Structure formats: structure tokens, C-alpha cells
Amino acid sequence: MRHRWEDRPVAPPPDGRPTEYLPFRQERGRHGRPGWLKARVPDGPGYREIKETMRGLSLHTVCEEARCPNIGECWNNRTATFMILGNVCTRSCGFCAVLTGRPQELDLEEPYRVADAVKKMGLRHAVITSVNRDELPDGGASVFAATIRAIRREVPGCAVEVLTPDFKGDRDAIKTVIDARPDTFNHNIETVPRLYPAVRPQAKYGRSLEVLRYAKELDPGVLTKSGFMVGLGEVEEEIVRTMRDLREHGVDILTIGQYLRPTENHLPMARYYTPQEFARYKKLGLEMGFSHVESGPLVRSSYHAHEQTEDARRGALGARG
């Protein structure tokens, strides 16, 4: 049986040594994952309430679709990331658990149901993401904008963060989202440039950097955010270079987390990073000038999103003196 990542060769790392990957059974075995990667089984009143709300309004969350390990903690803290534009993606990234295929027709009522859910859940910080919809002329940007505006009308005091696709670099699409005035604009770089052919074969590293730069150019007041995974075979100098690239393109908030292979059909994992290594990257990121760095084994884009935004705002105000 061949896997979808096996036809995606990448260049060797800068040190020239071939990358060795962990066998899937070792990753998932009883003694495979280190203790710091153990997450609680999702349960609790907050978790059940959010699940019922999402089901009742026919909404999707990336928490479920991408099999996020933090779903129990976040949902019990009344934090969820809404996934708009359906749950079928037009791309086939090597790390992602979201279904790939032909997407459904657009649901034009979805933005209003998301706003209704935000109101019912009493959220102070809503995160909106989506699958890629490359078949749409604007990549779904207009639906992002409609969702932001619907939340503003229903819950005026709620901060809105968007985690967008790259819209194939379409500046008009990026402007459509920024014109709706999100508080935070997030687009993930995901990995180091050398690994793009395997990890993000339909994306371009430079294009993602330009999306972030252009969003900040359009609205200097918006917080920009990006993140990447480690454990895919990158080396230290590539991690540091990627962090510098993001900072040089105006990114305010950085997230770094451990890649965890969703299934045997996804990209293999090279190694586990320790909590001490993540702490070192956080320190380095703050020294580079990021307003906030969330770096840890179980960190994902929206993990502690409200706290990230508040901390970054304080940092930006402090920098202005």
C-alpha cells in the first residue's frame, strides 16, 4: 500500500544527513509518546454543551475535523474554532486530517449560524477558520467577511480572529477579509520551506509570507499571526530561519507545536521535541521581537487564542512607549 506522501520527495536537510522517521506503531504504541504529550479524554459540561450547540446549528469545528488534542481543555473553557465553508478541502496537505475531495455547495446561512453560536456560547474571542476552497473565485474570502460582520452585529464586544487559507495569493481576497476588520489575522506557514513539497504541495512558502505581509500593510493595526509544526524532519537552522522570515514580514504572534501524525496515511514523524526545546524557541522568538510566542508540545494555532491576543496587544502598546 502506497501513501499519499510517498510521491512527494524533498531535498535533504542542510547538514546532508538523511532524515530517519519513527515507525507508526512506535508513535502510537503504549510506550511511544512521551508523557508531556498525553492529553485528557474530552469530557465535561462545557465540552458537552459546545458539542450540542455545534450539532444543533449544523456547524463544523476544526477542533474535531483536525483531531486536535486540546479539544477537551478548550471546549471546557468555552473556546472553539469554527470551520466555515464546509468540511471538505480542495487540497491534500500531508499533515492534515481534514477530508480532501470535492466540496459541497456554499451555505450562505452559515455566517449567521456561527454568529448565533458565538452568542449562545457567550464567547469573548471567536476564532474562524476554513478549508481551502480553490474552486471559488475568491477562495471563500467573502464568506469570511460575512461571518466577521455577523458576529460583530450579534456580539459587539467579541474579538474575532480569522485563520485563513492563502487564497492563492489573491490580494483582492485578502483585502475582502481585512476590510471586515478582524482583530487578528492568522495564516499558518506550517513548516520550513524545504519540506513544502511533502507538507504543503499546493502551497508556496513565499506566497504565504506575502499574504501575512500584505494583511499588515492593509491594516497596520491588525494583529498578524502565524505558526508552524516541528517534528517533520526540519533542522535547527531551518526553524530559526523560518522564525526570522515571519518576523521580517511583520508577524506579531507566533505559535510552535509538535507534529502528531493523524493516521498511517499521513506524513511520518521524525522526532519528538522536548518541553525544554519549545521553551528555548519561545525565548528566541521574544528576543526576535514577536509580541507573543506560544510554544509547546500540544500548542495549536488557536490554543489560548484569547490570552495570546491580549498579551500581544499589551506588548504592542508597551513597544510604542
UniProtKB/Swiss-Prot annotation:
[4Fe-4S] cluster 2 binds at C89, C93, C96. It catalyses: [[Fe-S] cluster scaffold protein carrying a second [4Fe-4S](2+) cluster] + N(6)-octanoyl-L-lysyl-[protein] + 2 oxidized [2Fe-2S]-[ferredoxin] + 2 S-adenosyl-L-methionine + 4 H(+) = [[Fe-S] cluster scaffold protein] + N(6)-[(R)-dihydrolipoyl]-L-lysyl-[protein] + 4 Fe(3+) + 2 hydrogen sulfide + 2 5'-deoxyadenosine + 2 L-methionine + 2 reduced [2Fe-2S]-[ferredoxin]. Its cofactor is [4Fe-4S] cluster. Its EC number is 2.8.1.8. One of its GO terms (molecular function) is metal ion binding. Binds 2 [4Fe-4S] clusters per subunit. One cluster is coordinated with 3 cysteines and an exchangeable S-adenosyl-L-methionine. Transmembrane segments: none annotated. Pathway: Protein modification; protein lipoylation via endogenous pathway; protein N(6)-(lipoyl)lysine from octanoyl-[acyl-carrier-protein]: step 2/2. Its main location: cytoplasm. It is found in: Cytoplasm. Residues 75-291 form the Radical SAM core domain. Residues 304-314 have a biased composition (Basic and acidic residues). Keywords: 4Fe-4S, Cytoplasm, Iron, Iron-sulfur, Metal-binding, S-adenosyl-L-methionine, Transferase. It comes from the Bacteria. Residues 1-21, 301-321 are annotated as: Disordered. [4Fe-4S] cluster 1 binds at C63, C68, C74, S302. SMART domains: Elp3. GO terms for cellular component: cytoplasm. Belongs to the radical SAM superfamily. Lipoyl synthase family. This is Lipoyl synthase. The gene is lipA.
